[in-house]
């Protein structure tokens, strides 16, 4: 009897392992391939379907926002560009009209706005509806960052409130205001989050916490709505003014190693394709994608690697 018990305890794990290898792994692999490579192609909307769609892009005065605006304008969309710097927005609009002969002055709406102010958010939506009577795509791109060593805050956590106001609460406010219009048009929201919203990262407790809040809100909202597509984008390091404007707590400019940064144009191309294919979440770096899969299995390893990578991205 004892001998049979030994055989059972040795044999049962072996049977389970055989079951996993021979049945579960092949099914899981096929499902992974279908979800990540086949289904997006089947869902992909043709470029021609974007003609006359109404698009709002925040943080559009430079970088990713400006590149997205240009590319949506080329697709024939009616584009609203929003930012705090009116002069820079006008330059972006002028570049549209100069570079793309098919884009007319009336196709681009420029709105100056501080999205941490609810009145500016309301004004943005009212002007878009007044001009075009609908909203099809919203790109929430405005944001700010900071590098802070938590132990050196000296009692002042205002930078945390500032980051949350722009990176999180402004997105919630704007989404609330456009929600009914997007439901009517079966529209899309593109949220520019960050890898800092996927991984806790050294020196980025303020920025990372705001981006984790963004991820939580829009993943939850996706479960509430059937008529609005939500695509969350997690870029890596992009060659934009965002990094040029990044400062430490004492106001000093942060020097970055930009050798492996992605261009804003390449980033924008991937974002537009992800929305066309109905992608739920776009992680734009290979390291980020691998880390996302491994985080649940090897959390200590991922913490070590993110700390090393984050520290190496800042010049000493």
UniProtKB/Swiss-Prot annotation:
Keyword Oxidoreductase: yes
Keyword Transit peptide: no
Binding site for substrate: 194
Keywords: Membrane, NAD, NADP, Oxidoreductase, Peroxisome, Signal-anchor, Transmembrane, Transmembrane helix
Transmembrane region(s): 19-39
Highest taxon in the source lineage: Eukaryota
SUPFAM superfamilies: NAD(P)-binding Rossmann-fold domains (SSF51735)
GO cellular component: cytosol; peroxisomal membrane
Cytoplasmic topological domain residue ranges: 1-18
Binding positions (NAD(+)): 56-80
Localization: Peroxisome membrane
Pfam (any one): adh_short
Primary subcellular site in the record, as a coarse category: membrane
Enzyme class at the top of the EC tree: oxidoreductase
Homology family: Belongs to the short-chain dehydrogenases/reductases (SDR) family.
PANTHER family: DEHYDROGENASE/REDUCTASE SDR FAMILY MEMBER 7B, DEHYDROGENASE_REDUCTASE SDR FAMILY MEMBER 7B
Function: Putative oxidoreductase.
Protein name: Dehydrogenase/reductase SDR family protein 7-like
């Amino acid at each position: 009897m004892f001998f049979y018990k030994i055989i059972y305890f040795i044999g049962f794990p072996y049977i389970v392992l055989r079951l996993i290898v021979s049945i579960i792994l092949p099914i899981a692999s096929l499902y992974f391939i279908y979800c990540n490579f086949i289904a997006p192609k089947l869902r992909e909307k043709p470029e021609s379907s974007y003609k006359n769609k109404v698009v709002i892009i925040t943080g559009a005065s430079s970088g990713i926002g400006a590149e997205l605006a240009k590319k949506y304008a080329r697709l024939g969309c009616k584009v609203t560009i929003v930012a705090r710097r009116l002069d820079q927005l006008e330059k972006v609009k002028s570049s549209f009209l100069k570079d793309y002969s098919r884009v007319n002055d009336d196709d681009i709406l420029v709105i100056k706005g501080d999205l941490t102010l609810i009145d500016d958010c309301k004004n943005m939506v009212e002007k878009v509806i007044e001009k075009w009577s609908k909203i099809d795509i919203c790109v929430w791109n405005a944001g700010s960052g900071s590098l802070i060593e938590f132990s050196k805050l000296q009692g002042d956590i205002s930078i945390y409130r500032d980051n949350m106001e722009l990176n999180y609460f402004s997105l919630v406010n704007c989404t609330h205001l456009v929600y009914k219009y997007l439901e009517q048009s079966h529209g899309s929201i593109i949220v520019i989050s960050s890898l800092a919203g996927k991984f806790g990262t050294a020196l980025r407790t303020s920025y990372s916490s705001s981006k984790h809040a963004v991820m939580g809100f829009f993943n939850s909202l996706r479960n509430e709505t059937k008529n609005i597509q939500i695509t969350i984008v997690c870029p890596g390091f992009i060659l934009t003014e965002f990094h040029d404007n990044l400062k430490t707590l004492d106001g000093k400019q942060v020097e970055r190693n930009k050798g492996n940064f992605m261009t804003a144009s390449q980033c924008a191309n991937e974002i537009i394709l992800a929305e066309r294919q109905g992608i739920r979440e776009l992680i734009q770096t290979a390291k980020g994608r691998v880390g996302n899969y491994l985080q649940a299995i090897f959390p200590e390893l991922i913490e070590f690697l993110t700390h090393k990578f984050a520290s190496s991205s800042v010049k000493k």
